[in-house]
A protein has these predicted regions:
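Core catalytic loop region at the nicotinamide-binding pocket of NAD(P)H-dependent oxidoreductases
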Residues: 45, 85-126
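C-terminal beta-strand-loop-alpha-helix "lid" module of Rossmann-like NAD(P)-dependent dehydrogenases
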Residues: 43-85
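Alpha-helical segment proximal to the catalytic Tyr-Lys
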Residues: 36-39
């Protein structure tokens, strides 16, 4: 069994996350491909998709954005920065990831994706329910862009 840790941003994306989000999209694609390739050998592939988890990731991942030479980015950086407190309140404990890993490892199913936490479940359901243009507009509105 192969259990990969992705993120909800492997299936949807948010402002200022291009590089990180792309890495998670890669994990999703890799996992889907490996599922096809290894299924005949009896291997199970699982993907864990956490949402916002309580950690210092948000502050560390946004350090690049505070570069004064990225002047054109500053309005976006400021808008996203104003949301930081709200993101912190929404964060779920790391245990939701551990619970999703445990479920994936022990449920005996062929399920591929396991959202980790209620916020992840809600965000992915919201994305699945919307077409691309509506999702883009709603995301811009959510972040005040």
């Amino acid at each position: 069994m192969l259990i990969n840790i992705s993120s909800i941003v492997g299936r949807l994306t948010y402002p200022l996350g291009a590089v990180y989000d792309a890495s998670k999209y890669a994990i999703e694609g890799f996992s889907e491909a490996m599922r096809f390739e290894l299924e005949a050998m009896g291997a199970k592939i699982k993907v864990i998709e956490p949402g916002l988890i309580a950690s210092d990731f948000g502050s560390r991942s946004m350090q690049f954005a505070h570069d004064p030479s990225l002047e054109a980015y500053q309005p976006l950086v400021n808008a996203m920065g104003s949301m930081a407190a709200k993101f912190t309140e929404m964060a779920e404990p790391a245990e939701v990831v551990a619970e999703a890993v445990w479920k994936a490892a022990t449920d005996g199913s062929d399920t591929l994706r396991y959202p980790a936490g209620q916020a992840a479940i809600a965000a992915l359901a919201d994305r699945d329910a919307l077409d691309d243009l509506t999702f883009y507009a709603k995301t811009k509105e959510r972040f005040g862009l």
